[in-house]
């Protein structure tokens, strides 16, 4: 699968998604949009995905991506939703499969994360065959 085409298809289907990244089942960043540099944040993202998939996983109160802090408002095996309290956007992290694979998206600050949730989760499910 061409991850760049995949991400741009998501962004075309869901205009509220401003940036996105794909992390594979080994926890490696395999694609990110050009203006979103999250390689320094991948370990934290992998930890959250690992915890959310455990029966007794520990919810973190927040996460930082590109030095911006987001408060985690939903923590389920299907999704992790976080929002920046200074209105600088939202993060939807959609785990894929049973490993560390995930689709990570940055959502338009003027929209709510739920506006993009259906399309983000729908696209994340398309990654399951790969990861």
Task: Describe each region flagged by the PLM.
Residues 1-131:
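Non-catalytic interaction/Regulatory regions outside core domains
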């Amino acid at each position: 699968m061409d991850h760049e085409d995949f991400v741009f298809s998501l962004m075309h289907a869901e205009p509220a998604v401003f940036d996105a990244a794909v992390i594979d089942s080994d926890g490696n960043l395999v694609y990110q949009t050009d203006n979103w540099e999250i390689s320094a944040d991948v370990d934290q993202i992998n930890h959250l995905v690992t915890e959310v998939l455990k029966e007794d996983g520990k919810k973190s109160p927040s996460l930082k991506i590109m030095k911006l802090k987001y408060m985690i408002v939903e923590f389920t095996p299907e999704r992790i939703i976080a929002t920046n309290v200074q209105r600088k956007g939202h993060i939807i992290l959609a785990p894929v499969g049973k490993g560390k694979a995930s689709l990570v998206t940055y959502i338009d600050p003027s929209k709510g994360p739920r506006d993009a949730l259906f399309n983000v989760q729908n696209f994340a499910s398309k990654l399951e065959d790969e990861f």
